[in-house]
Amino acid sequence: MPPPQIKQDLNRSGWESTDFPSVCENCLPDNPYVQMLKEDYGAECKICTRPFTIFRWKADRTARTKRTTICLTCARLKNCCQCCMLDLSFGLPIVVRDAALKMVAPGPESSINREYYAQEHEKEIQEGRGAVEAYEKTDEKARELLRRLANSEPYYRKPRQQLEGPSDDSTEAQPTDAPVVQSRYGNGPGPIRTSESRRGTPLPGRGRGNMRGGRAGRPFPGTAQIPPSPEDYLPPADPNIMSLFVTGVEDDLPEHTLRTFFTQFGQLRSLICSHRAHCAFINFATREGAEAAAQHCKGKAVIQGCPLRVRWGKPKPLDNMDREERMKNAREGRLTVQAQKDGESGQRAITAAGEPATEKPQSFVVAPPPGSGDVQYSSLSGD
């Protein structure tokens, strides 16, 4: 008689095991060769609570690791991305899409019913019916509403601006009579952000308006608000100075933006940026590049909305004295040592001319002889 066979677990047989995820283009990097880490049955789906295959990858070397959060069946059922859970057709949240298409229906509550619900719909999706046909039967007006919602751009959308980038065609297509918007601070496009704008205070400056002092409650102006002086951008007399000193560097201003801004004036030898000290040193390879940058900035610049002060560097070498001054200091040192020696010899001569100096013998403590501590008693002598 053959041994009894173990009953096959139907729920375990329905666990997902796939070789490729269903992810939108925004979650994937531009490089077509993406390295992904696959983990079978790594976590449970957030919708159907079934174990599924997790995929992890990085869009960039400095980006955070992305991963899939729902299984492939639920992603196909919802027609959304496994990572960001946005609709694949319109790029909108699935809650907004279902509300516009009037496809919101109460789903199962318990974990067993969710697994059964996902298994049944997985069979329907494989057969090409079910949820796939439901999206095709939706109202055309509702789909048009979703298209308009998807095309509406907010005030600031970072991914789209990064993908498009600056183009020369768009600049040439602008009419000549359009007003030219210039920054109220200096060089650089975009609004200027200050510490007051981040805190929401109406007064300009770094001080608080309720403080009473020598300025009668008025805040002291910041470094960026003080107008630069000509000595900040005029070339110094020393031709060896080829560095610029930049102050006002914020914590979120990356170093590569400073490098990109100053590279257009000439080749850089090095760039030292200290976000803790809120300053940076830009060392140019040639004096002409440093002079061009200083003349263009005129003591101030705006990079990504961050106002900066630009001035010439002032190196302080250890040996900045000329040869005559060094020789003068050396002669003064030798004369001081000679005077000390002469003073000691004079004191010795005065002592020799007077009374002869008698050397006093040193007093030594004499140790007692051995046996002096023994006491002799008459009773012990035998008398």
From Swiss-Prot:
GO cellular component, one term: post-mRNA release spliceosomal complex
This protein's name: Pre-mRNA-splicing factor slt11
Region spans: Disordered: 148-228, 330-383
Primary localization: nucleus
Keyword Transmembrane helix carried by entry: no
Alphabetical UniProt keywords: mRNA processing, mRNA splicing, Nucleus, RNA-binding, Spliceosome
SMART domains documented for this protein: RRM
Function: Involved in pre-mRNA splicing. Facilitates the cooperative formation of U2/U6 helix II in association with stem II in the spliceosome. Binds to RNA.
InterPro entries in the record: Cwc2/Slt11 (IPR039171), Nucleotide-bd_a/b_plait_sf (IPR012677), RBD_domain_sf (IPR035979), RRM_dom (IPR000504), Slt11_RRM (IPR034356), STL11/RBM22-like_N (IPR048995)
RRM domain sequence ranges: 242-315
GO biological process: mRNA processing; RNA splicing
Subunit structure comment from the entry: Associated with the spliceosome.
Family: Belongs to the SLT11 family.
Organism: Aspergillus fumigatus (strain ATCC MYA-4609 / CBS 101355 / FGSC A1100 / Af293) (Neosartorya fumigata)
Annotated localization: Nucleus
GO molecular function, one term: U6 snRNA binding
Compositionally biased tracts (Gly residues): 206-216
Signal peptide feature range: none
